[in-house]
Amino acid sequence: MAVMKFTWRSIIPRCSKGIEEAEAEAEAETKKQDSKQGSFSRLAMIDFSYPSSMFTEDLSTSLAGSNLYVFTLEELKVITQCFSSANFLGEGGFGPVHKGFIDDNLRPGLEAQPVAVKLLDLEGLQGHREWLTEVVFLAQLSHPHLVKLIGYCCEDENRLLVYEYMPRGSLENQLFAKYSVPLPWSTRMKIALGAAKGLAYLHEAEKPVIYRDFKASNILLDSDYSAKLSDFGLAKDGPEGDKTHVSTRVMGTRGYAAPEYIMTGHLTAMSDVYSFGVVLLELLTGRRSLDKSRSPREQNLAEWARPMLNESRRLARIMDPKLEGQYSETGARKAAALAYQCLSHRAKQRPKMSDVVNILEPLLDYGETSVASFVYTVPTHQKGGSPPKDDTDTKECEAKTELKKENGHHRNRHHHRRSHKSRDGHRHQNKSSSQSSVHSENDTSKQNLENGSNEECNID
């Protein structure tokens, strides 16, 4: 039995429409789907005022073909040791996240693996709607660059999600945490490519999905620094038929949201492309998308950096100093040119994510090199004498240019070894920092925007 893709209106229409209008729409949608798929059990009209047992039964029945596990709250208490502080990974806008471990002792057939258990904070920035959005999308979407949802729990007022565990945490943590090991150039391009593939998959699905909240804290990294998109609470179905956009309330994170989306509320796949350009800039510069601790003209990364992306001399000035010049100049120019296109103020001039993938893939072949260093040598003359009559008759400005081809594989292996040694340090930091990873997601809700951090919110 094929699993049909649900929209928000088919699941909780009463959240956004009058009951009569929602019922009419649901009936029409049912007839449409029945004609395509025969007899398929779809969610009845439901809202959160219904008993949770009825809600859980409807949800689990409708997602029966998705292979999601429906966990009990007691089971999740067991695997997290009652949500022990020792297993605490971090906290974000959704709520706290704890590490756990599942195997066939918990449920027959369960693969033994560490997991991240995310608990909805009823007083947090997100709620039932975002929780259900994530369940519905991740139950039906599967790709190497999307985080895997293993199961969920819905008991009384409790809403939990169980994901695969991502040991390297978030890209935000890797780039900006105080004691993080600097990411090598090749690793940064690998992360950019993986995230781009995840977005391209969403945009080119049979029923396209607009991610709407693409940012560094939502890009999680496995042990090999392979990027996976997480947190689908704000995702939306793409426009259908002859529609060019989805009209919606403006939601997202300051510094990442596309300007036309902020101005009009018109959401398209190109909105995600703009956000990707911002993250690519963060990878190039080592700067946050929004940093109010900087001078006013440098606070918004995209506005400050974009004019310099097409000029080689100016580009060198904005590259991340943590790279210490160890990057491919050609690769950096190509990546910067791509970021420039993605950040175009005209949405139609931005590339599709499939084109972004094609541009990024060759950049993995560029090795890490030392950028040119210039050393000025001025000859000294004897006091009261004249300059010697040789090759130094006149003052020279000798430019010594060194280009060292480095073994990128060796450097990455050294970086991974250093990261492994400091993993316990990162784990301790995740427990104590407001920028902690939450399977790993950063606590954007508690960061102070005035101090330069981003904030997930309604964007007015």
Swiss-Prot record:
Give the chief site where it resides.
membrane
Expression sites (tissue/organ): Mostly expressed in roots and, to a lesser extent, in leaves.
Q: What happens when the gene is disrupted?
A: In plants missing both EIR5A and EIR5D, enhanced V.dahliae virulence leading to altered accumulation of reactive oxygen species (ROS) and reduced activation of cell death. This phenotype is due to both impaired V.dahliae EPD1 effector-triggered immunity (ETI), associated with cell death, and compromised pathogen-associated molecular patterns (PAMPs)-triggered immunity (PTI), charaterized by ROS production.
Q: Which residues bind ATP?
A: L89, G90, E91, G92, G93, F94, G95, P96, V97, K118
Q: Where is the Protein kinase domain?
A: 83-364
The record describes its post-translational modification as: Phosphorylated at Tyr-163 and Tyr-165 in the presence of pathogen-associated molecular patterns (PAMPs); this triggers the expression of pathogenesis-related genes.
Q: Which Pfam family name is an example for this entry?
A: PK_Tyr_Ser-Thr
Q: Does the keyword Hydrolase apply?
A: no
User: Which UniProt keywords are given for this protein, alphabetically ordered?
Assistant: ATP-binding, Cell membrane, Hypersensitive response elicitation, Kinase, Membrane, Nucleotide-binding, Phosphoprotein, Plant defense, Serine/threonine-protein kinase, Transferase
User: What GO terms fall under cellular component here?
Assistant: plasma membrane
Which residues are annotated as active site?
A: D213
A Gene Ontology molecular function term for this protein is: protein kinase activity
Question: What's the catalysed reaction?
Answer: L-seryl-[protein] + ATP = O-phospho-L-seryl-[protein] + ADP + H(+); L-threonyl-[protein] + ATP = O-phospho-L-threonyl-[protein] + ADP + H(+)
Residues with the Phosphotyrosine modification: Y163, Y165
Q: Origin, by domain of life?
A: Eukaryota
Induction annotation? Induced by the V.dahliae elicitor EPD1 (AC G2WWH6).
- According to its UniProt record, the EC number is 2.7.11.1
> Where does the record place it?
Cell membrane
Is Lipid metabolism set as a keyword in this record? no
Transmembrane portions of the chain: none
Q: How does it assemble?
A: Interacts with the V.dahliae elicitor EPD1 (AC G2WWH6).
Function recorded in the entry: Required for pathogen-associated molecular pattern (PAMP, e.g. chitin and flg22)-triggered immunity (PTI) involving reactive oxygen species (ROS) accumulation and triggering plant defense, including defense-related gene expression (e.g. PR1 and LOX). Ensures specific recognition of the EPD1 effector of Verticillium dahliae, resulting in a hypersensitive response known as effector-triggered immunity (ETI), characterized by the activation of programmed cell death to limit infection by the pathogen.
Q: Which family does it belong to?
A: Belongs to the protein kinase superfamily. Ser/Thr protein kinase family.
Annotated protein name in UniProt:
EPD1-interacting receptor-like cytoplasmic serine/threonine-protein kinase 5D
Instruction: State the organism named in the record.
Output: Gossypium barbadense (Sea Island cotton)
| Gene this protein is translated from | EIR5D
